[in-house]
Amino acid sequence: MSTTTQNIPWYRHLNRAQWRAFSAAWLGYLLDGFDFVLIALVLTEVQGEFGLTTVQAASLISAAFISRWFGGLMLGAMGDRYGRRLAMVTSIVLFSAGTLACGFAPGYITMFIARLVIGMGMAGEYGSSATYVIESWPKHLRNKASGFLISGFSVGAVVAAQVYSLVVPVWGWRALFFIGILPIIFALWLRKNIPEAEDWKEKHAGKAPVRTMVDILYRGEHRIANIVMTLAAATALWFCFAGNLQNAAIVAVLGLLCAAIFISFMVQSTGKRWPTGVMLMVVVLFAFLYSWPIQALLPTYLKTDLAYNPHTVANVLFFSGFGAAVGCCVGGFLGDWLGTRKAYVCSLLASQLLIIPVFAIGGANVWVLGLLLFFQQMLGQGIAGILPKLIGGYFDTDQRAAVLGFTYNVGALGGALAPIIGALIAQRLDLGTALASLSFSLTFVVILLIGLDMPSRVQRWLRPEALRTHDAIDGKPFSGAVPFGSAKNDLVKTKS
């Protein structure tokens, strides 16, 4: 950027169409967050009515993560072939329909299936909205685009918590899910009133349709084998998370089977760049493992361990959700200032100072607990707002939505494991200690994976001929693309 350009406030670099595109996607993500967290808010009520164990109840949260990998792949491919806008609209309709079905669910299995539908829609919304906004904004503002967008999910969670405190005590938990049908009206407005992403339009102007992940996996020479593997993965995940298996060895074998299938899909879809894709799945897996025990089970902790009433729970969750939303925006500024990976690491290190005090303070002082949660979630959860930017930078526009959606949502199975692991540990320890220990230890794993740029590093080790040296979104160099001790100037000079 020129000196003159740098002196212009960042928001003046955006025109009216770009702001409208962002606003529409942000509202869609807010509604996504609203619908998705409803189950966490009413988990104890659902558990009591259906007579579920703690692990079975936690699996209702996990269910939405089980189907996310497939939703991310299919709806991401739709976004790559037909445009980001159509994929966004389809995603909103899916998660809204699933939420309505939860309100009518007569029992555990029906609600589990409805949560699978929500997971597919959520995955599509994440991939399509993220690529839509990132590709619509100027390159030097794309960390802000990512962070600002993802803040919508946390705002949706805050709104859901407030609605919970007003609706559930009067009309019961089912009424909360009936409200979740409203986003379909918004989806119809979206279909007519927002433009397509600029990067996608430029890439596809006057050209034949691209070959998407769906084409490669389900219309190519290995389509029969891939369909069989898809069914096998879905079945294995069902048995792992539906609360039917108690044998840890069998669960481990099924988990390894799923991992092998997902790696096979990544190898087929990305060719020589498969090491990057696989490592990104690992990064996202641990990102969910450190963050989602708190996200999923915090309402249960507040209601059971601290014995808070619904109104107090809503107030504490407001601090938590608002902190995450603010953190997404702060993360966007940090990412554009320090660089995506450096901002991520610094924010997570700071969050580690707060995680133990959050669960050690107890429930005597609600306001102190709320403030601690605000800052911990701002630093620890909010920085995940720039994760779509981080992942998307490793891939070109042609496959970005599908690969981002698939990579992110396979890794998001950590979110399915997290509440169950937290619930299992809580059978031996109190829930607060379980949540704190999980989050504290696994955050360090994410710090190492991102700080060392392991996706680029493993790519360089295994398939160096396909190594990408610079971010495809903002053009900045990847630190892991060069060995330790190599001159960074060499990387800047050899930009390809």
Swiss-Prot record:
Pfam families: MFS_1. One of its GO terms (cellular component) is plasma membrane. The chain crosses the membrane at residues 22-42, 58-78, 92-112, 116-136, 148-168, 170-190, 224-244, 247-267, 278-298, 313-333, 353-375, 406-426, 431-451. CDD domains: MFS_SV2_like (cd17316). GO terms for molecular function: carboxylic acid transmembrane transporter activity; sialic acid:proton symporter activity. It is a multi-pass membrane protein. It is found in: Cell inner membrane. It catalyses: N-acetylneuraminate(in) + H(+)(in) = N-acetylneuraminate(out) + H(+)(out). Its main location: membrane. Catalyzes the proton-dependent transport of sialic acid. Belongs to the major facilitator superfamily. Sialate:H(+) symporter (SHS) (TC 2.A.1.12) family. This is Sialic acid transporter NanT. Keywords: Cell inner membrane, Cell membrane, Membrane, Sugar transport, Transmembrane, Transmembrane helix, Transport. The keyword Transport applies.
